[in-house]
């Protein structure tokens, strides 16, 4: 199936996108030597609600990644409709590019990955790539217990990303600056949107 295309899928709520997401994108492109990184904002997440509507989050992503070589922002999950399960997105882009894509998640996802819809299929149909978010030992131990062999999972060697969208929304709500937390292209708009 693999045609030589090295494709990464980076999904998330991006509510809002922050500098940590941008760092993950840059390091992922470099470390995995990707031909293309597809950033996919979730449309209808199965386990949590988003604050900002899809259109707003999609618009912010487009602004931030505009001009960044090899990055594409996709509205696939909106077009597909229904609940946004990652396996459907993986299968879709796998078929489009005729390759087994890399699927990028934060290391906190390892603590509940077995609860993801068709998680075994995700592991079979993509190469799981994990970026650091905290000191990851407990997550790795849990994943080892539940998933078994982790040798097929790629753990990115990059700085730990500790910024969270939840923290950003809270900062905006109480009127604190988001300088350094979100890209400058969208900072003022994000401050106003989530502000009290």
Swiss-Prot record:
Name of this protein: Probable nicotinate-nucleotide adenylyltransferase
Taxonomic lineage from the root: Bacteria, Thermotogati, Thermotogota, Thermotogae, Thermotogales
Pathway recorded for this protein: Cofactor biosynthesis; NAD(+) biosynthesis; deamido-NAD(+) from nicotinate D-ribonucleotide: step 1/1
Family classification: Belongs to the NadD family.
Assigned EC number: 2.7.7.18
Species: Thermotoga petrophila (strain ATCC BAA-488 / DSM 13995 / JCM 10881 / RKU-1)
EC class: transferase
Record-linked SUPFAM superfamilies: Nucleotidylyl transferase
HAMAP family, per the entry: NaMN_adenylyltr
Catalytic activity field: nicotinate beta-D-ribonucleotide + ATP + H(+) = deamido-NAD(+) + diphosphate
Keywords: ATP-binding, NAD, Nucleotide-binding, Nucleotidyltransferase, Pyridine nucleotide biosynthesis, Transferase
Gene Ontology terms: biological process: NAD biosynthetic process
């Amino acid at each position: 199936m693999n045609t030589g295309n090295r494709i990464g899928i980076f999904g998330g709520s991006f509510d809002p996108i922050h500098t940590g997401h941008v760092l993950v994108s840059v390091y992922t492109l470099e470390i995995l030597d990707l031909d293309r990184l597809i950033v996919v904002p979730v449309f209808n997440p199965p386990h949590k609600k988003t604050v900002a509507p899809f259109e707003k989050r999609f618009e912010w992503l487009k602004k931030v990644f505009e001009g960044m070589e090899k990055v594409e922002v996709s509205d696939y999950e909106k077009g597909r409709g229904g609940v946004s399960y990652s396996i459907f997105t993986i299968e879709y882009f796998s078929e489009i590019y005729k390759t087994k894509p890399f699927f990028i998640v934060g290391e906190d996802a390892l603590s509940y990955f077995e609860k993801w819809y068709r998680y075994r299929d995700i592991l079979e149909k993509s190469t799981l790539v994990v970026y650091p978010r905290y000191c990851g030992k407990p997550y790795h131990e849990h994943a080892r217990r539940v998933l078994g062999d982790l040798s097929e999972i790629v753990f990115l060697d990059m700085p730990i990303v500790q910024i969270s969208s939840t923290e950003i929304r809270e900062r905006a709500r109480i009127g604190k600056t988001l300088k350094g937390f979100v890209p400058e292209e969208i900072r003022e708009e994000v401050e106003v949107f989530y502000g009290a």
